[in-house]
């Protein structure tokens, strides 16, 4: 990735692809395959199949240190018909990304891209969690943890995000504790 413009174009492309092809909770097969291919193209090691279609990718800078920070994005969509005239409207009848999970996944891909471009500045190992089934109970996160997708004892912190329509575009809000969970 050479420029901010390249990243912006890619973010738009990835998000529109994901938005066009939404999948319901625990049915995120093609979304998972899209992410896996993206990771392979960048030689990022990952494991998949967590809670069905979940993925955990890793950027390891110290193989002797089991500690890491985790970044998480959800992948599932809602059983809602999208009525949107945009060219990137859902192509799957009765299913749409109405909660922004296409954006969340895109943001995590973009973060990984930026991290790879600045890997020499990293001071900790990182894990990237693509979670299926966020909109159902029990959710994909609890299933992934039960299955051992990450070693919670070695996780120094987990970061997630959620789009917030009430905030001005281009701004970021932070909360010190659990938020929107």
Regions found by a protein language model. Give the residues of each.
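Histidine/acidic-residue-rich, glycine-tolerant segments that coordinate divalent metal ions
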Residues: 78, 85-96, 103, 120-181
